[in-house]
């Protein structure tokens, strides 16, 4: 049971050997189908994900923390379409026979591992970012620096997972040059655990906690807004003072809202802020107004999540669900072949789950178009400008 056969070892481009699809397919039958399907897939991935990147870069309304990660995810899919899919399609057209150099095969394996891992890690990074924004708002930075650092970390970790392949791990004695696959079973297990089986449960747990916290926050905000509504008297009698506005003084205009907590007021001229009439009763009313403590006001501002961010978050469960549907079969087959060399896995099944995984790279722009009205309108605007 050597490690040089693609039917004995799983790889992120598993089954690239003469036995994977029978004899060389060339441009007849399966080879022609692979060529047409591959060209269409590459075109869809390039067009859709380029549109995502251009739209976010050109439209300020889309430049949100969540969409920074979506651009990073689109970049991983674009690199996959440029660096991996052409060679994958070439191998499929040849019936699974690798006719190029072993060194190019190792580079292909490393890029495939890195980009697949980067996609998963970017989804995990989104879950971490949203979890912090909802549950620890005081520590959340909306300016983008933390998000960019998190994105950089995802790419560095992805490169670290893939680096052993280009550092000689695939150079084993008796290697078959007609087969392009990962030659080390231990590394197959290691990369599968690091790239999929470990981050996916963590990501799902964080998303569950995030949306649970968001529902609680919105319910509390709704209750607080209703409790602050001023009560108007329904009949004759002295006016009822609003506990949130302080004592009632008929000679005074209503107090300026959030004068101490609004950051925009700090830029107004003093003359503008002092133009309301004043009287001794007004001074007394202002002194009697209950002021919330400063840390509490900062906490309310920090916990606020914009409507645009909430819209961006609604599409995330669909993106994660599509990713899991497309990649889970591949990784299950992938690790099964590594842990059970005696188990027979149909080469056509291996090819099918590999294609399914790559199809995911074309799905995300379609998901954004269907489930996010803001992305949809910007896509239309961008296409009109380019056409």
Swiss-Prot record:
Disruption phenotype: Mice show a significant reduction in daytime contrast sensitivity. The keyword Transferase does not apply. The chain crosses the membrane at residues 35-57, 68-90, 107-128, 147-170, 187-208, 315-337, 347-369. Disulfide bonds join 105-180, 340-343. Detected in olfactory bulb, hypothalamus, olfactory tubercle, brainstem and striatum. SUPFAM superfamilies: Family A G protein-coupled receptor-like. Palmitoylated. Palmitoylation of the C-terminal Cys is important for normal expression at the cell membrane. Na(+) binds at residues 77, 119. InterPro entries: Dopamine_D4_rcpt (IPR002185), Dopamine_rcpt (IPR000929), GPCR_Rhodpsn (IPR000276), GPCR_Rhodpsn_7TM (IPR017452). Pfam families: 7tm_1. GO terms for molecular function: dopamine binding; dopamine neurotransmitter receptor activity, coupled via Gi/Go; epinephrine binding; G protein-coupled receptor activity; identical protein binding; metal ion binding; norepinephrine binding; SH3 domain binding. Residues 1-34, 91-106, 171-186, 338-346 are extracellular. Its main location: membrane. Keywords: Biological rhythms, Cell membrane, Disulfide bond, G-protein coupled receptor, Glycoprotein, Lipoprotein, Membrane, Metal-binding, Palmitate, Receptor, Sodium, Transducer, Transmembrane, Transmembrane helix. One of its GO terms (cellular component) is centrosome. SMART domains: 7TM_GPCR_Srsx. The keyword Membrane applies. It is a multi-pass membrane protein. It is found in: Cell membrane. PANTHER family: ADRENERGIC RECEPTOR-RELATED G-PROTEIN COUPLED RECEPTOR, D(4) DOPAMINE RECEPTOR. Belongs to the G-protein coupled receptor 1 family. Dopamine receptor responsible for neuronal signaling in the mesolimbic system of the brain, an area of the brain that regulates emotion and complex behavior. Activated by dopamine, but also by epinephrine and norepinephrine, and by numerous synthetic agonists and drugs. Agonist binding triggers signaling via G proteins that inhibit adenylyl cyclase. Modulates the circadian rhythm of contrast sensitivity by regulating the rhythmic expression of NPAS2 in the retinal ganglion cells. Forms homo- and heterooligomers with DRD2. D4.7 allele exhibits higher affinity for homodimers compared to DRD2 heterodimers, while alleles D42. and 4.4 have similar affinities for both. The interaction with DRD2 may modulate agonist-induced downstream signaling. Interacts with CLIC6. Interacts with GPRASP1. May interact with ADORA2A. Interacts with KLHL12. This is D(4) dopamine receptor. The lineage of its organism: Eukaryota, Metazoa, Chordata, Craniata, Vertebrata.
């Amino acid at each position: 049971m050597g490690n040089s056969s693609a039917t004995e070892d799983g790889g992120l481009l598993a089954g690239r050997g003469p036995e994977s699809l029978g004899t060389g397919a060339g441009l007849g039958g399966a080879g022609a189908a692979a060529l047409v399907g591959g060209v269409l897939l590459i075109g869809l991935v390039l067009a859709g994900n380029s549109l995502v990147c251009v739209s976010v870069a050109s439209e300020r309304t889309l430049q949100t923390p969540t969409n920074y990660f979506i651009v990073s995810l689109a970049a991983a899919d674009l690199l996959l379409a440029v660096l991996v899919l052409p060679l994958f399609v070439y191998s499929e057209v040849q019936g699974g026979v690798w006719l190029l150099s072993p060194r190019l095969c190792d580079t292909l394996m490393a890029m495939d591992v890195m980009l697949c891992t980067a996609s998963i890690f970017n989804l995990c990074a989104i879950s971490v970012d949203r979890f912090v924004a909802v549950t620890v708002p005081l520590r959340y930075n909306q300016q983008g620096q933390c998000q960019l650092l998190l994105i950089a970390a995802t790419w560095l970790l992805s490169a670290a997972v893939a680096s052993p392949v280009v550092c000689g791990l695939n150079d084993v004695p008796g290697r078959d040059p007609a087969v392009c696959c990962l030659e080390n079973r231990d590394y197959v297990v290691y990369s599968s655990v690091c790239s999929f089986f470990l981050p996916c449960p963590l990501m799902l747990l964080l998303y569950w906690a995030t949306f649970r916290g968001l529902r609680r926050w919105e319910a509390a905000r709704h209750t607080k807004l209703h409790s602050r509504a001023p009560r108007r008297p329904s009949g004759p009698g002295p006016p009822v003072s609003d506990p949130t506005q302080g004592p009632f003084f008929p000679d005074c205009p209503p107090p300026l809202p959030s004068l101490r907590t609004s950051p925009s007021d700090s830029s107004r001229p003093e003359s503008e802020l002092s133009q309301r009439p004043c009287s001794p009763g007004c001074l007394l009313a202002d002194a009697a107004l209950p002021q919330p403590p400063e840390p509490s006001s900062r906490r309310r501002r920090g916990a606020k999540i914009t409507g645009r961010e909430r819209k961006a978050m609604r599409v995330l469960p669909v993106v994660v669900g599509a990713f899991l549907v497309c990649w889970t079969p591949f990784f299950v087959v992938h690790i099964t072949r590594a842990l059970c060399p005696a188990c027979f896995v149909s080469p056509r099944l291996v090819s099918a789950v590999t294609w399914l995984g790559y199809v995911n790279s074309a799905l995300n722009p379609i998901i954004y178009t269907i489930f996010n009205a803001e992305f949809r309108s910007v896509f239309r605007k961008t296409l009109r400008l380019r056409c």
